[in-house]
């Protein structure tokens, strides 16, 4: 029986590593290699080797796009956290009988393609859309306001798509809280705010960091959200990559932008693991 289990484990590990090598490592190495080549009109890329593609990343135009991507993704992440934390906390405190239903409602949007959902959001936010019509009927607005083709529309779209990715890790972290710690804090005279900021918040920080990463990292590359809700006025890093590959046909520079985004994501993941390790050590010491 042990021999069978060992063989099964080896086969499973081999399949996983093979998948990672062929579909993650090799494609990224190819992109890295192309990023050091020169643009060619007929073959997309050619020799000689150059680092000009990476020096172009520091062009003020592209630096502004990176800053816009970080700022809009950061704002969307903060909004997701402010909405997701109370919702996840509520989910963990209701009767266990109703939790599966709420979890089902959280993951239900994943059953529909995100592109179709963004088209629906475009209709919702339009000048003659549901939102403007509802606000006018309620007397809040006297005339429709333009939300589409603005940064606000892009942020709304990012929050709409990525909110479940914030709720799920937060719910997992909050559900694991030891109620005895909260009772002990209450017995020691801690009020509601003190219990939250000194007990609940530190213990759920790994879930907060994980949720922020799961929202922030994909948000920077969702070019179709900026295309449909922001028009030509709002650009994310993903829009630059798409444009360089499909429109400008500058594959080397598009590859360099992709590698730059990958490095940025890797740094953020490294920060997450370091912060998570330090938080766990702090909790153990306390």
Curated annotation (Swiss-Prot):
Classification via CDD domains: TM_PBP2
Keyword Transport: yes
Membrane topology listed for this record: Multi-pass membrane protein
PROSITE patterns on file: ABC_TM1
Periplasmic-side positions: 34-71, 121-151, 220-252
PANTHER family referenced in this protein's UniProt entry, alphabetically: INNER MEMBRANE ABC TRANSPORTER PERMEASE PROTEIN YDCU-RELATED, INNER MEMBRANE ABC TRANSPORTER PERMEASE PROTEIN YDCU-RELATED-RELATED
Function: Required for the activity of the bacterial periplasmic transport system of putrescine and spermidine.
Protein name: Spermidine/putrescine transport system permease protein PotB
């Amino acid at each position: 029986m042990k021999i069978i289990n060992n063989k099964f484990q080896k086969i499973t590990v081999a399949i996983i590593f093979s998948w990672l090598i062929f579909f993650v490592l090799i494609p990224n190495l190819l992109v890295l290699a192309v990023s050091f080549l020169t643009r060619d009109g007929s073959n997309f890329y050619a020799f000689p080797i150059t680092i000009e593609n990476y020096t172009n990343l520091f062009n003020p135009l592209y630096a502004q796009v990176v800053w816009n991507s970080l700022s809009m993704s950061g704002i969307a992440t903060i909004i997701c956290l402010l909405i997701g934390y109370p919702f996840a906390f509520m989910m963990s405190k209701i009767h266990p009988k109703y939790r599966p239903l709420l979890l089902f409602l959280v993951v239900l949007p994943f059953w529909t393609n995100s592109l179709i959902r963004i088209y629906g959001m475009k209709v919702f936010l339009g000048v003659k859309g549901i939102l403007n019509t509802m606000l006018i009927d309620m007397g809040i607005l006297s005339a429709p306001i333009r939300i589409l083709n603005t940064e606000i529309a892009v942020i709304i779209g990012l929050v709409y798509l990525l909110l479940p990715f914030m709720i799920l890790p937060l719910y997992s972290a909050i559900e694991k809280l030891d109620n005895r710690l909260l009772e002990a804090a209450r017995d020691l005279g801690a009020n509601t705010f003190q219990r939250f900021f000194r007990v609940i918040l530190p213990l759920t920080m790994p879930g907060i960091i994980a949720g922020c990463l799961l929202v922030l990292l994909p948000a920077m590359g969702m070019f179709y959200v900026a295309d449909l809700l922001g028009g030509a006025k709002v650009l994310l890093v993903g829009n630059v990559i798409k444009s360089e590959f499909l429109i400008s046909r500058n594959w080397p520079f598009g590859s360099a932008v992709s590698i730059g985004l990958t490095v940025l994501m890797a740094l953020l993941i490294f920060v997450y693991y370091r912060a998570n390790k330090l938080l766990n050590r702090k909790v153990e010491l306390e």
